[in-house]
Amino acid sequence: LLASSAASDVYKRQVQGVQRALGVDTRIKWPNDAVLNGKKLCGILTEMSAQIDYINYVVIGTGINVNQTEFPEEIAEIATSLAIEMGHPVNRAKIVAAVLEAFEENYEKFLEAGDLSALQEAYEAVLANKDQPVRVLDPKEPFEGVALGITSTGELRVRKEDGTIAEVHSGEVSVRGLYSYV
């Protein structure tokens, strides 16, 4: 859950930074993508080593498609870059500075709360999946429902077709929109 919370926190920062630097409407596609105009703009990977009651480390790797103008055919329909969306090359240093500034501003809130509760409202405001029909590709039991938001520890809350609420852990599934990538 810590890795999920940390990743969610980093995504919120990326989205805030890109929005500040360029004024574009970037959104979070839970659990590990940031999207712009319905296409993937950023990706994140997390790795954690832990023991019972002790975390050795959490490593977060993130990437933003900044000035890429072409994508391989197999992802061309679902991927984009800032340069494509803006119509011109983008200053990478400006993006990095804005992302780091946004990260720093909210880092203390995250540490104080120990989870995403202090950031949950702002996170959900940029959550592309919120109130949208989704297909949860859980290998044990795939299902469809409506994404409601996240928990204070980063799980996606989904109202299933039978009315029950499922809390989906990021390491378990892939979430897709019913009608598109988002």
Over which residues does each language-model region extend?
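Single conserved hydrophobic/aromatic residue that forms the stacking wall/gate
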Residues: 1-7, 11
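PP2C/PPM family metal-dependent serine/threonine protein phosphatase catalytic domain
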Residues: 75-85, 170-178
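Acidic (Asp/Glu) carboxylate-rich active-site/surface patches
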Residues: 12-53, 63
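Conserved, helical-rich catalytic subdomain that frames metal- and/or nucleotide-binding sites
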Residues: 85-140, 178-182
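Short, acidic (Asp/Glu-rich) active-site segment that either coordinates a divalent metal cofactor
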Residues: 53-83
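Conserved RNA-binding domains used in RNP assembly and mRNA/RNA metabolism
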Residues: 130-182
